[in-house]
Protein backbone atom coordinates (compact mmCIF):
# COMPACT_ATOMS: atom_id res chain seq x y z
CA UNK A 1 0.00 0.00 0.00
CA UNK A 2 2.74 2.59 0.76
CA UNK A 3 4.25 1.96 -2.70
CA UNK A 4 0.88 2.47 -4.37
CA UNK A 5 0.24 5.59 -2.31
CA UNK A 6 3.67 6.97 -3.17
CA UNK A 7 3.11 6.16 -6.83
CA UNK A 8 -0.25 7.88 -6.73
CA UNK A 9 1.39 10.95 -5.27
CA UNK A 10 3.94 10.93 -8.06
CA UNK A 11 1.52 10.30 -10.85
CA UNK A 12 -1.47 12.23 -9.63
CA UNK A 13 0.76 14.87 -8.05
CA UNK A 14 -0.19 13.61 -4.72
CA UNK A 15 0.92 11.18 -2.14
CA UNK A 16 -2.29 9.98 -0.74
CA UNK A 17 -0.87 10.38 2.67
CA UNK A 18 -3.85 9.12 4.55
CA UNK A 19 -2.42 8.63 8.00
CA UNK A 20 -4.35 8.44 11.18
CA UNK A 21 -6.33 6.12 13.31
CA UNK A 22 -9.56 4.70 11.99
CA UNK A 23 -12.56 5.24 14.21
CA UNK A 24 -14.86 2.36 15.08
CA UNK A 25 -17.99 2.32 12.96
CA UNK A 26 -20.15 2.75 16.05
CA UNK A 27 -18.63 6.13 16.89
CA UNK A 28 -19.97 9.39 15.56
CA UNK A 29 -17.85 10.72 12.70
CA UNK A 30 -15.44 13.39 13.85
CA UNK A 31 -15.22 16.80 12.24
CA UNK A 32 -12.49 16.93 9.61
CA UNK A 33 -9.30 18.45 10.92
CA UNK A 34 -8.67 21.95 9.59
CA UNK A 35 -5.29 22.49 8.01
CA UNK A 36 -3.34 25.66 7.56
CA UNK A 37 -2.02 25.29 4.01
CA UNK A 38 1.16 27.33 3.58
CA UNK A 39 1.50 28.09 -0.12
CA UNK A 40 4.92 28.71 -1.64
CA UNK A 41 5.05 32.29 -3.01
CA UNK A 42 4.15 32.33 -6.70
CA UNK A 43 2.92 28.73 -6.80
CA UNK A 44 -0.05 27.94 -9.05
CA UNK A 45 -3.02 25.90 -7.80
CA UNK A 46 -3.64 22.77 -9.88
CA UNK A 47 -7.41 22.29 -9.57
CA UNK A 48 -7.76 19.37 -12.04
CA UNK A 49 -5.07 17.33 -10.29
CA UNK A 50 -6.40 18.18 -6.83
CA UNK A 51 -9.90 17.04 -7.82
CA UNK A 52 -8.53 13.88 -9.47
CA UNK A 53 -6.67 13.05 -6.27
CA UNK A 54 -9.86 13.50 -4.25
CA UNK A 55 -11.71 11.19 -6.66
CA UNK A 56 -8.90 8.63 -6.30
CA UNK A 57 -9.26 8.77 -2.53
CA UNK A 58 -13.01 8.16 -2.88
CA UNK A 59 -12.32 5.06 -5.01
CA UNK A 60 -9.73 3.75 -2.52
CA UNK A 61 -11.82 4.62 0.57
CA UNK A 62 -15.48 4.73 -0.55
CA UNK A 63 -16.98 5.15 2.93
CA UNK A 64 -14.78 8.07 3.94
CA UNK A 65 -14.91 11.71 2.88
CA UNK A 66 -11.84 12.83 0.93
CA UNK A 67 -9.23 14.51 3.12
CA UNK A 68 -8.25 18.14 2.62
CA UNK A 69 -5.74 18.12 -0.22
CA UNK A 70 -4.11 20.87 -2.25
CA UNK A 71 -1.73 20.53 -5.19
CA UNK A 72 0.37 23.37 -6.56
CA UNK A 73 3.39 23.75 -8.81
CA UNK A 74 6.11 26.33 -9.27
CA UNK A 75 9.12 27.06 -11.47
CA UNK A 76 11.32 27.33 -8.36
CA UNK A 77 14.01 24.65 -7.88
CA UNK A 78 13.16 21.69 -5.63
CA UNK A 79 15.85 22.58 -3.07
CA UNK A 80 14.62 26.16 -2.72
CA UNK A 81 11.00 25.05 -2.18
CA UNK A 82 12.17 22.37 0.28
CA UNK A 83 14.13 24.94 2.28
CA UNK A 84 11.07 27.20 2.41
CA UNK A 85 8.81 24.48 3.85
CA UNK A 86 11.44 23.07 6.22
CA UNK A 87 12.01 26.53 7.71
CA UNK A 88 8.28 27.33 7.89
CA UNK A 89 7.71 24.04 9.76
CA UNK A 90 10.61 24.72 12.11
CA UNK A 91 12.69 21.71 11.06
CA UNK A 92 16.47 21.95 10.82
CA UNK A 93 17.29 20.76 7.31
CA UNK A 94 16.39 18.13 4.76
CA UNK A 95 18.14 14.81 5.41
CA UNK A 96 19.84 13.10 2.45
CA UNK A 97 17.45 10.13 2.70
CA UNK A 98 14.87 8.44 4.96
CA UNK A 99 17.57 6.60 6.92
CA UNK A 100 19.15 9.89 8.03
CA UNK A 101 22.65 8.41 7.79
CA UNK A 102 21.48 5.16 9.43
CA UNK A 103 20.00 6.94 12.44
CA UNK A 104 17.31 5.10 14.42
CA UNK A 105 14.97 8.09 14.15
CA UNK A 106 13.30 8.91 10.85
CA UNK A 107 14.01 12.54 9.91
CA UNK A 108 11.07 14.98 9.66
CA UNK A 109 12.19 15.95 6.14
CA UNK A 110 14.20 13.88 3.70
CA UNK A 111 15.04 13.46 0.01
CA UNK A 112 14.01 10.46 -2.07
CA UNK A 113 14.08 9.64 -5.77
CA UNK A 114 12.16 7.46 -8.15
CA UNK A 115 11.24 6.51 -11.70
CA UNK A 116 8.22 8.18 -13.30
CA UNK A 117 7.18 5.23 -15.46
CA UNK A 118 7.37 2.59 -12.71
CA UNK A 119 5.27 4.82 -10.46
CA UNK A 120 2.65 5.38 -13.17
CA UNK A 121 2.50 1.65 -13.94
CA UNK A 122 1.87 0.95 -10.25
CA UNK A 123 -1.32 3.03 -10.27
CA UNK A 124 -2.55 2.15 -13.76
CA UNK A 125 -5.47 0.04 -12.39
CA UNK A 126 -6.60 3.02 -10.30
CA UNK A 127 -6.37 5.33 -13.32
CA UNK A 128 -8.61 2.92 -15.25
CA UNK A 129 -11.20 2.99 -12.45
CA UNK A 130 -11.12 6.80 -12.65
CA UNK A 131 -11.54 6.69 -16.46
CA UNK A 132 -8.23 8.49 -16.94
CA UNK A 133 -6.55 7.37 -20.16
CA UNK A 134 -2.98 8.48 -19.59
CA UNK A 135 -0.30 7.49 -22.10
CA UNK A 136 2.15 5.94 -19.65
CA UNK A 137 4.78 5.50 -22.37
CA UNK A 138 5.37 9.25 -22.04
CA UNK A 139 6.22 8.93 -18.33
CA UNK A 140 9.97 8.78 -18.87
CA UNK A 141 12.78 9.75 -16.54
CA UNK A 142 13.83 9.95 -12.94
CA UNK A 143 12.65 12.43 -10.34
CA UNK A 144 13.81 13.82 -7.01
CA UNK A 145 11.37 14.36 -4.19
CA UNK A 146 11.26 15.66 -0.63
CA UNK A 147 8.94 14.30 2.06
CA UNK A 148 8.13 16.69 4.94
CA UNK A 149 6.09 15.33 7.85
CA UNK A 150 3.04 17.10 9.20
CA UNK A 151 3.23 19.31 12.24
CA UNK A 152 0.36 20.40 14.50
CA UNK A 153 -2.45 21.56 12.19
CA UNK A 154 -0.14 21.75 9.18
CA UNK A 155 -0.30 19.03 6.51
CA UNK A 156 2.33 16.68 5.26
CA UNK A 157 4.11 18.13 2.22
CA UNK A 158 5.47 16.15 -0.71
CA UNK A 159 7.62 17.98 -3.25
CA UNK A 160 8.68 16.48 -6.57
CA UNK A 161 10.52 17.58 -9.70
CA UNK A 162 9.78 16.72 -12.47
CA UNK A 163 6.34 15.14 -12.25
CA UNK A 164 4.02 13.32 -14.67
CA UNK A 165 0.64 14.97 -15.25
CA UNK A 166 -1.76 12.09 -15.97
CA UNK A 167 -4.48 14.48 -17.16
CA UNK A 168 -2.23 15.73 -20.00
CA UNK A 169 0.05 12.68 -20.38
CA UNK A 170 3.21 14.72 -20.15
CA UNK A 171 6.23 15.17 -17.93
CA UNK A 172 6.21 18.64 -16.36
CA UNK A 173 9.60 20.14 -15.47
CA UNK A 174 8.31 22.15 -12.52
CA UNK A 175 8.27 21.51 -8.77
CA UNK A 176 4.99 19.92 -7.66
CA UNK A 177 3.79 20.70 -4.13
CA UNK A 178 1.28 18.27 -2.60
CA UNK A 179 -0.22 19.04 0.80
CA UNK A 180 -2.30 16.32 2.45
CA UNK A 181 -2.84 14.81 5.90
Ranges and model annotations:
Residues 22-181:
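An acidic-aromatic pocket/loop used at catalytic or ligand-binding sites
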Residues 17-20:
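C-terminal motif of bacterial Sec signal peptides marking the signal peptidase cleavage site
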Amino acid sequence: MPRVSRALAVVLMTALALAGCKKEKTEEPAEPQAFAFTVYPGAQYLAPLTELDKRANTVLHPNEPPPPIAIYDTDAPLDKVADYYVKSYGFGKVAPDATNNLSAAKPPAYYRSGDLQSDVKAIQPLLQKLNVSADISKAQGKYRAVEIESKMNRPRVTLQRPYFDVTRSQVIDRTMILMAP
